[in-house]
Every structure is written in structure tokens, then in C-alpha cells.
């Protein structure tokens, strides 16, 4: 075991537990008809659930409830632009500060406890005790609901510290390989005893800001990812971009958040003036508009592939096969222009039915050769 596993992580868990029990010990009054919805995971996860969130407002079960939505701060602009009507108020969680700053953690959990919720629903399928479950556990809610899920790969210590009966009700959410948008719809509409609605992620978006000076014809590359193992070599992106420029006359537009700057700057340095670097220059809504006007997106497994699919942009996404089925490939009924590209070994296991999606290392996508990506793009290109 590493020093992190032996010392750092147990110390973090001890600190988190101390804060949790300190908050739980503080008296708080439960108030009637106050519903908490927890969806604090990432942008892609939000895209795959947002069309279902309005069902709570329309339901008989929660008619007249004051609804509070708790989300990841990275999704705030999407929520405020498209979905603010689904809740009476929203609370935004900075997950980095929540994991690193015990004062922030304490005050955030205290805010949830003192809000006096009567009901709490955790909308996250892959949950962890230290983050997602504690948001519900500190609340005053008498009725707590979540999806039944398989265990995450956590340490024996964290498993021991996780309370045995966190939720008063666990709903079956379908097979592990079920596409998450379908899983979310099934869970929410089943919980509310409402007929299911067609599953969609579609978003309407306007023109990109004129100040971005986009080329007339272009494709988008998103080389960065919040997960350090979800990487495809810079030289592979560059070789792919050069071929698309030669073959189709398109300009590569590099996009990403400021956190992706290491990957985007490296790619822009290789491609030079033949590319446009928009790293850190687009809001999420701006990025949607850029993707809407693009001929296609080439990206690793990250939220960008779901943003692109939501505005009808053709997606060529690189995936390891980890969580196969949940986030890719997209069902044909949702889009026919989403092309998930996997390493050869993963593809063989998919064909033979031997793929254990959780056992695939996330970093396997680095093994995908440029030639394979170009074959998929050429085969599915639309002028």
C-alpha cells in the first residue's frame, strides 16, 4: 500500500467523520413539505438527467413542496440558463473545496441541516459516502430515497464508516450497463408514479459570441479531462487534426476550461497558427454554441461529448470501456451521430460478451491508435 492509502486517506476520512458528527449533533427542526434533490456529480451526468428534473414540480407526490436543488457549481450556468424553473432555490457545491477545506465542509453541511428538509432524494447512481451520501445524511429528512447501486471501489475503512441504513427507500435502477439517461428517467418517473417520457438531452442554443472570431468551417478538439488517466497523447490529437485539415479543409478549434490548459497549450504549440485556441475563453453556454456550429467534436471521455450530443454535433469520442453502456455508446433513438471509439481489446470483449466494464482501466484509451480514429471519422464523415 502507498503512503496515501496508509496515512493520507485514513486521516482525511477521520476529519470528514469528525465534521459529519459535529454537524449531526446540532439540533435542527424539520419543516413540512420541503424537498431536497441532490445531483452533485459532473457536467455530463447533469446533461443526462436534466430533462427529467421538471417531473418533481409536476408530480402529485410533491405538489406544493418547496424544492431545493443541490448541484455541482460547474453546472450552475446550465441550470440557470435552461432549468431554473424546476426548483424554488438552488445550492451550489464546490467539490474541491468540500474535499480540501474543513471549514467550508462544516458550513456547507450546516446549511443543509438547518434548512429543515422533510424529504431528500439522491439522484446520483455512483455515490460515495464522503461526498454524496453525507449531503443527505446530515439533513433532517425523514424520507430519504436513492437508487440501488453496486458498491464503488472504496477502502475497507470507508466501507466500515458508512452507515448501514442511510436511506429509507432504495429503488432498483436497472442493469449496470443501462444508459444513464434511461436509468434516470426510469428512476424518477417510477418514483413519482408518472408515465415515462421520451429520453432526450437536446438543448437549444443561440449563435456563438462574435468576439470568439471562429473560422468559417471548423471542428472542435477537447483534449483535457478532469480525470488524469483519461488522456490521449498530444501527438495523436495533432496527427488527427492535421489529417482532417488536409482532407477536408477544416480548422481545428481547441476548447477546454482553465484546468485543461496543460493539455490544450501543448496541442496548440504543436499545431501552431493553423489552429484556434479557445481555452478558458468560453462559458458553458458559449461552448454549446461553438459545438453547434462545428462539423464534429473529437474528445476523450468527458462532459464535452454529452454537451456536443445535446446540440446535435457529430461526436467522435475516445473511451476505455470503463462504465461501458452507461455513458457511451448513445442509444440510436437519441442520436445517430455519436461514435464511441474503444481500444481493440475492449472491442473484442464487447463482441464476445466478456467485458466486465468496471474492470477496464480508465487509461486504456491511450492505446487507441490514430489510424483507427481516422478510419472511424472517414467512414462516418458527412460533407
Where are these regions (language model features)?
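Catalytic machinery of carbohydrate-active enzymes
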Residues: 1-383
Amino acid at each position: 500500500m502507498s503512503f496515501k492509502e496508509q496515512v493520507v486517506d485514513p486521516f482525511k476520512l477521520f476529519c470528514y467523520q469528525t465534521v459529519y458528527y459535529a454537524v449531526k449533533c446540532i439540533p435542527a427542526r424539520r419543516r413540512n413539505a420541503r424537498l431536497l434533490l441532490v445531483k452533485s456529480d459532473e457536467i455530463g451526468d447533469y446533461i443526462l438527467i436534466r430533462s427529467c428534473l421538471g417531473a418533481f414540480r409536476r408530480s402529485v407526490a410533491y405538489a406544493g413542496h418547496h424544492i431545493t436543488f443541490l448541484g455541482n457549481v460547474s453546472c450552475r450556468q446550465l441550470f440557470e440558463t435552461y432549468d431554473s424553473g424546476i426548483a424554488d432555490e438552488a445550492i451550489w457545491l464546490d467539490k474541491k473545496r468540500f474535499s480540501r477545506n474543513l471549514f467550508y465542509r462544516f458550513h456547507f453541511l450546516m446549511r443543509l441541516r438547518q434548512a429543515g428538509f422533510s424529504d431528500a432524494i439522491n439522484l446520483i447512481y455512483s455515490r460515495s459516502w464522503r461526498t454524496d451520501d453525507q449531503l443527505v445524511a446530515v439533513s433532517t429528512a425523514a424520507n430519504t430515497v436513492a437508487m440501488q447501486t453496486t458498491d464503488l471501489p472504496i477502502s475497507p475503512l470507508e466501507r466500515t464508516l458508512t452507515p448501514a441504513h442511510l436511506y429509507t427507500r432504495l429503488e432498483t435502477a436497472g442493469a449496470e450497463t443501462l444508459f444513464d439517461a434511461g436509468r434516470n428517467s426510469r428512476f424518477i418517473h417510477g418514483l413519482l408514479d408518472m408515465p415515462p417520457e421520451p429520453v432526450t438531452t437536446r438543448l437549444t442554443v443561440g449563435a456563438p459570441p462574435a468576439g470568439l472570431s471562429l473560422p468559417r468551417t471548423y471542428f472542435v478538439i477537447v483534449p483535457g479531462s478532469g480525470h488524469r488517466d483519461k488522456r490521449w497523447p498530444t501527438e495523436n490529437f495533432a496527427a488527427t487534426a492535421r489529417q482532417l485539415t488536409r482532407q477536408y479543409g477544416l480548422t481545428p478549434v481547441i476548447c477546454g476550461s482553465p484546468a485543461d490548459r496543460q493539455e490544450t497549450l501543448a496541442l496548440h504549440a504543436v499545431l501552431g497558427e493553423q489552429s484556434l485556441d479557445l481555452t478558458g475563453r468560453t462559458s458553458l453556454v458559449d461552448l454549446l454554441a461553438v459545438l453547434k456550429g462545428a462539423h464534429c467534436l473529437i474528445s476523450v471521455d468527458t462532459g464535452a461529448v454529452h454537451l456536443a450530443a445535446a446540440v446535435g454535433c457529430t461526436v467522435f469520442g475516445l473511451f476505455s470501456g470503463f462504465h461501458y453502456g452507461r455513458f457511451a455508446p448513445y442509444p440510436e433513438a437519441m442520436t445517430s451521430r455519436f461514435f464511441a471509439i474503444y481500444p481493440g481489446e475492449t472491442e473484442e470483449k464487447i463482441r464476445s460478451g466478456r467485458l466486465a466494464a468496471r474492470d477496464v482501466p480508465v487509461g486504456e484509451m491511450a492505446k487507441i491508435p490514430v489510424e483507427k480514429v481516422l478510419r472511424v471519422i472517414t467512414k462516418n464523415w458527412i460533407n
